[in-house]
Structure formats: C-alpha cells, structure tokens
Amino acid sequence: DVTLPGLLQEHGVDLFHGTCFAVPLVGGRPDTAASGFRVDPGTGSHAGTDSLGIRVGDAITMPKQYVSLAGNRATGRSFDDRVGCAAQILALRRLDSRRLRHSVLFIFSTREEVGLEGARFAAQRLGGEPIRVHALDTFVSSDAPLEIKTFANALVGRGAVARAVDNSSVTPPALVDSLAALARARRIPLQIGTTNGGNDGSTFTRFGVPDVAIGWPLRYSHSPAEVIDLADLLALADLTRAIAEAW
C-alpha cells in the first residue's frame, strides 16, 4: 500500500484542468492509503463534475499562498520557520544598538529538518564563545480540537513561548525564570512550554553554551495549512529584541 504522511488531513488543494483550477477539499485520515482520499469540488453529481472540465488524471497541488483568517490569524505553508526569520528581522529593525550590553549575533541557518546542518556549522565556528544561544523555532502546539493537551499546551494567540524542555535539551530553570522576569518587565506575553522535537540551539550545548529556545505556538505543523496568530509573532520579535538589549 502507498501511504500518505500525517500532514495530509483535511485541507484545500488546487485542482488543475486546462488553464482553470478549483479549490476543493481533500478528506481522509493521516497515514491512510492513498485510495482512501478524495477531492470534493463541491458538485453534487458526476455530470456536474464533468461540466467543470475535471477529468481522471488531473493533477492537484497544495496551495502555496498566505491567507488571512479571522482576527490576527493566518494560514499558509512553511511558517516553520519563516515566522522565526520574520521575528528576527523585526527585532533587528527595532533594535537600539546603544542599549546592547553584549555583542549580539543573529544567525539565519538552513537545513534544520535534515540534521541541524546550518546551525551545526555555526556552532563549530563559534564553539563556546557565546554566553547563551536562543533558537527561534516553532512550538508545535496542542491547541487544536483533536489534540491531546498533555504536552505542548501553549495556546495560539497568548504570546511567545519559552521551551523549558524538549527532546534535544533542557533549559536551566534559572534561565527560564530570568527570561520570564524579563518578559514581565517588558510587558511581553510569554508562555512556558515543554514539547517533543528539538531545536537548532542544541548544537551549541556540546560546547557548554546554554540553549534557551524561544518560539511561537503553531497549529498543524508541517502541513500546507499551518496556522499562526500574528500577535504571537510580534511578541516573539519583542522578546528577541529585549533579550538582545537587556539580558
């Protein structure tokens, strides 16, 4: 059997037939056989589907565009880790270099999902020189209707997240407390979370550098329809700036 990964649940697809496309819905459960999936173009009969020009063998692709949802919410693909990059850029734009207590290095690294390769190169170059490292990465949230709340229960729309524990590192509790105090002083909404997965900052721990990973809550991670709250992005940018200026 051919199985499809868990990212293919219910979401929109673009269905191409000639020069036109429809935006139907794919239905099914994750990790089920490909034959168990269907495309629903919204028609009520075979004849109605034929009238749209849809034929067996037509190709489908996942939507690639950014879509605004209700309130501050948005959906799209690859928010992990485009949101982290956006937060760093916003922090850099707002940073007051006169307030820096230390030299601060911003790194945009690549290939995290296939072995932390970009971050590992940076860690090898810098060694134990940094005081701390802060990976800006997705916090895969259980804030969705069908998710179990035991783990990763940081709510979308409630601010940035500090990772206390994940599979790659344990943040020293004193640093978690200090970060939370900084966020309170700057009136930045911050949640403390524990989760599975890992983060780029763990490549520095072998050199004795504490990894204090921060991020934002994300629904439906690694799918073409990830969901974020833009307020969380802004909170992460503010927290990144505060860390650079005052910690």
Where are these regions (language model features)?
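N-terminal hydrophobic/helix-forming segments and targeting peptides
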Residues: D1-W247
